[in-house]
């Protein structure tokens, strides 16, 4: 839902001027360093070299805390040695807390200048103090605060101004620092400031700070032909500007501490695994949330919502979740129902109907609570004293209901009150998920600079915490409270969609990218933003398909669903004032939707398995190509294509009037998912121009992968290797936890190989009872990329000849045509073989093999197994 206003707010601390930095501070000297006998951590003290009053007084003595919590994670924490400073609350983002004893600085001799970990080595200089982080494996320096080359100033640490810089190699590729609408793609652009301060600035504005704050970046470098990735997190919730100059990076922060975490990687997947092991693994999502969602601000009554559901059915476009924006509320008041337009009995009848169809219902909640003496939610909130204060009273703001107070989610009483209100509403309306919006916080009706469209930075939270300090964690704290409430009320796996996010939000909520435009540029930017959030640990992400506002041309909506069908979170949503944009509004768009969403629904088991991988290791669902091809430097800046998982590549049309797409194909064989007779082969990796008429989206599966699908499990393997592997996770998706060992989940490893004139496909099942209880079977096998002949003989199923089985197996084949680069050599065609009628139980190990009639079989370029 849009806010009342859309204005650009920027925090300008100091423009990227070297003179400005040098004038601010002269740095610190290290005066002591000691090793803790308990855990091997180090504690040191720093003394300011020369104090001044620019931006306030320097903090005289700082405490330095260093530790290695894992083999691949280093922490460097710098704070005031004499006074406790604000940090992201340890009860919200759980992590090790440095010693909290504030004492006098010691002046013991500094006897070490290097602290070694298994992979990351910390090196520091004494005067002026600086530190560098170096890899043990290749000697590469990944972070270096020394200003010896005078490209930036010394470290500055004042009460309301902190500054620190690092040098960088000019060929480093950086990603992250969001949420930001990056018009130039996912790769950070030198000489652009990146502001981090959660605010309600719509994504209409490009290259600007948006709803979330994620002060983390990934650095990908190619060192002598080998790729190394690492990540750096500055865990700080204050507003900050980050200046990237190509050869250096400077942080300018308006408070808090320096709390740096370094993650060694070395692969991009290693990095997100290490990062999410600290900030929290992404939340497991219910299976239904991976279906298609429809929403609009302006579904003004139950009949309109019912018509939308009916029209999707008539158009034969899949729809799993219907949403209501604030239209269902009484006067925009949270936890209320407009009994005129949404009569309780009529709404319950509608929900009963869609629930029987397997559909779900999600509604919006804004944090602002209407100030109304007859409003029970307000009354109970006042009685429990749950609102943010200003000058001793609840802060009065203006949002949709009129005058509002904002809940203080740092207050334990607020969390309890919020949970009780959700319980009460759920008893009234059996919702399946919640959408928490405008939680940056968004507010209007007062004058401020930094606090414009939010609450004053001098407002305060529980225990006297200033809004100045806690502003950017508001949406995060609300997501935690909402997750706790839904879990308690439903006893099921919660689904929450949040606009504002912070470090760790992915542990509790999905995210959509806010109020975007119905423009071609917004379509392009949606991919970059989606890929960034995978790096941030929020893999369940998507943008408003067809754009939130203004009117969207038919051609654009046509192309947008071809992209949006492959967002991890796939939802069509539009503004109240925009024309209707449901996918059935245009004939050509409906056809594209049936095609693209039809493929998405086939991919649901695959997407759900990616959801499991994300929950277990932080692996993004949607990924940049460099995650799978880190040595292929041509894809480092690629933002117009993306991968789902490690091997499924989407290459959409993103420009008006185009009926073909120029796509980059990393080295190997790629199989078209919509027409498996088409194969793209590139020996060294290159651009290919592919046809892309309306209703066609280029989706390709890479060699050596196994792809579990609805009715299909695909096994492509490489022409040179003849081996493929993959996996499938199944469970009761209502369980709060997503894991093996609970008796209600199954995990399958699939394998396939070609050799000695035979093809073999087999599985290894862990805890198969759940899959057996669901009656799931593999019905069809398709093998792609066979050389020589398609003729199949001597089919064996679990060691027995298929002729001994009572089932009838159908065998068919098609020729595959290759698109081969002009510089490449090799075969120009192959064969795909399909076996139907297998009915192999998913919950039991299976082994199927057959002989090929020709001796010309060389290897398997790809294969596919289909499960029903």
Swiss-Prot record:
Top-level enzyme category: hydrolase
Keywords: Apoplast, Carbohydrate metabolism, Cell wall, Cell wall biogenesis/degradation, Glycoprotein, Glycosidase, Hydrolase, Polysaccharide degradation, Secreted, Signal
GO cellular component, one term: apoplast
Pfam families, alphabetized: Gal_mutarotas_2, Glyco_hydro_31_2nd, Glyco_hydro_31_3rd
A Gene Ontology BP annotation from the UniProt entry: cell wall organization
Claim: Chaperone is one of the keywords in the record: no
Reactions catalysed: Hydrolysis of terminal, non-reducing alpha-D-xylose residues with release of alpha-D-xylose
Signal peptide annotation: 1-23
Active site, UniProt feature: 437, 440, 515
Main location: secreted
CDD domains to which the protein is assigned, alphabetical: GH31_MGAM_SI_GAA (cd06602), GH31_N (cd14752)
GO molecular function: alpha-D-xyloside xylohydrolase; carbohydrate binding
SUPFAM superfamilies from the UniProt entry: (Trans)glycosidases, Galactose mutarotase-like, Glycosyl hydrolase domain
Subcellular location: Secreted, Cell wall; Secreted, Extracellular space, Apoplast
EC number: 3.2.1.177
Glycosylated sites: 144, 222, 301, 372, 442, 756, 798, 804, 847
PANTHER family per UniProt: ALPHA-GLUCOSIDASE (PTHR22762), ALPHA-XYLOSIDASE 1-RELATED (PTHR22762:SF127)
Family named by the database record: Belongs to the glycosyl hydrolase 31 family.
This protein's name: Putative alpha-xylosidase 2
Organism: Arabidopsis thaliana (Mouse-ear cress)
């Amino acid at each position: 839902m849009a806010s009342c206003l859309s204005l650009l707010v920027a925090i300008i601390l100091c423009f990227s001027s070297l003179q400005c930095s040098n004038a601010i501070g002269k740095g610190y000297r290290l005066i002591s360093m000691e090793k803790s006998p308990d855990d091997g951590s180090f504690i040191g003290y720093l003394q300011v070299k020369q104090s001044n009053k620019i931006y306030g007084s320097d903090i005289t003595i700082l405490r330095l805390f260093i530790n290695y919590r894992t083999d691949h994670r280093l922490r460097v924490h710098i704070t005031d040695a004499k006074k406790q400073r604000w940090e992201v609350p340890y009860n919200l983002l759980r992590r090790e807390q440095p010693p909290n004893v504030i004492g006098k600085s010691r002046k013991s001799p500094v006897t070490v200048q290097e602290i070694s970990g298994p992979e990351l080595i910390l090196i520091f200089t004494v005067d002026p103090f600086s530190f560098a982080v170096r890899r043990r494996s290749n000697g590469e320096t990944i972070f270096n605060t020394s200003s010896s080359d005078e490209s930036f100033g010394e470290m500055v640490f004042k009460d309301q101004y902190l500054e620190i810089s690092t040098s960088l190699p000019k060929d480093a590729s950086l990603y992250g620092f969001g949420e930001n609408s990056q018009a130039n793609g996912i790769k950070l652009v030198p000489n652009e400031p990146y502001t981090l301060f959660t605010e309600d600035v719509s994504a209409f504005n490009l290259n600007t700070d948006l709803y979330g704050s994620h002060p983390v970046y990934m650095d990908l470098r190619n060192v002598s032909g080998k790729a190394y990735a690492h990540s750096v997190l500055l865990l700080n919730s204050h507003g900050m500007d980050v200046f990237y100059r190509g050869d250096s990076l400077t942080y300018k922060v308006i408070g808090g501490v320096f709390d740096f975490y370094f993650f060694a990687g070395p692969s991009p997947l290693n990095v997100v695994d290490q990062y999410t092991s600290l900030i929290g693994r992404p939340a497991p999502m219910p299976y239904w949330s991976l279906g298609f969602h429809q929403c609009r601000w302006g579904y003004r009554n139950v009949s309109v919502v019912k018509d939308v559901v009916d029209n999707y059915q008539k158009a034969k476009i899949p729809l799993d979740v219907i949403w209501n924006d604030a239209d269902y509320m009484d006067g925009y008041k949270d936890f209320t129902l407009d009994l005129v337009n949404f009569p309780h009995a009529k709404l319950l009848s509608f929900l009963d109907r869609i629930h029987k169809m397997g559909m779900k219902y999600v509604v919006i909640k804004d944090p602002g609570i209407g100030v109304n003496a007859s409003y029970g939610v307000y009354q109970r909130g006042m009685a429990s004293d749950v609102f943010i204060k200003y000058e001793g009273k609840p802060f009065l703001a203006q949002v949709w209901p009129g005058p509002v107070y904002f809940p203080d989610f740092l207050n334990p009483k607020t969390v309890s009150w919020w949970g009780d209100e959700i319980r009460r509403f759920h008893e009234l309306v059996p919702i399946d998920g919640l959408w928490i919006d405008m939680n940056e916080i968004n507010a209007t009706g007062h004058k401020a600079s930094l606090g414009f469209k939010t609450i004053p930075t001098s407002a305060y939270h529980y225990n006297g915490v200033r809004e100045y300090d806690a502003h950017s964690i508001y949406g995060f704290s609300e997501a935690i409270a909402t997750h706790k409430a839904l879990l308690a009320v439903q006893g099921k796996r919660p689904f929450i969609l949040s606009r504002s996010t912070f470090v760790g939000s992915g542990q509790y909520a999905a995210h959509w990218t806010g109020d975007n435009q119905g423009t071609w540029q917004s379509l392009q930017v949606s991919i970059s933003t989606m890929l960034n959030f995978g790096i941030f640990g929020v893999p369940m992400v998507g943008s408003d398909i067809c754009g939130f506002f203004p009117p969207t041309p038919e051609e654009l909506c046509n192309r947008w669903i071809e992209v949006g069908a492959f967002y991890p979170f796939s939802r069509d949503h539009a503004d109240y004032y925009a024309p209707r944009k449901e996918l059935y509004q245009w004939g050509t768009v409906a056809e594209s939707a049936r095609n693209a969403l039809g493929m998405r629904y086939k991919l649901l088991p695959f997407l759900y398995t990616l959801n499991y991988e994300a929950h277990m290791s932080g692996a993004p669902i949607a990924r940049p190509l460099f995650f799978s091809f880190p040595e292929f430097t041509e894809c480092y800046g690629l933002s117009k294509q993306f991968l789902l998982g490690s091997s499924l590549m989407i290459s959409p049309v993103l420009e008006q009037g185009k009926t073909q797409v120029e796509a980059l194909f990393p080295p190997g064989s790629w199989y078209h998912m919509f027409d498996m007779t088409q194969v793209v082969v590139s020996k060294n990796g290159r651009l290919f121009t592919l046809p892309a008429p309306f209703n066609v989206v280029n989706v390709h599966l890479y060699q050596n992968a196994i792809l579990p699908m609805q009715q299909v499990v695909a096994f492509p393997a490489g022409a040179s290797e003849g081996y493929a592997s993959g996996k499938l996770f199944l469970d009761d998706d209502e369980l709060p936890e997503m894991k093996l060992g609970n008796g209600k989940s199954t995990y399958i490893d699939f394998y396939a190989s070609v050799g000695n004139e035979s093809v073999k496909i087999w599985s290894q099942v862990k805890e198969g009872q759940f899959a057996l209880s669901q009656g799931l079977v593999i019905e069809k096998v398709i093998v792609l990329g066979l050389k020589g002949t398609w003729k199949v003989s001597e089919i064996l199923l679990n060691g027995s000849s298929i002729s001994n089985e009572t089932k009838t197996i159908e065998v068919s084949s098609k020729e595959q045509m290759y698109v081969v680069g002009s510089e490449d050599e090799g075969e120009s065609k192959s064969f795909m073989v399909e076996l139907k009628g297998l009915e192999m139980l998913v919950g039991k190990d299976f082994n199927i093999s057959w002989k090929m009639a020709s001796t010309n079989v060389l290897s398997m370029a790809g294969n596919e197994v289909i499960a029903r």
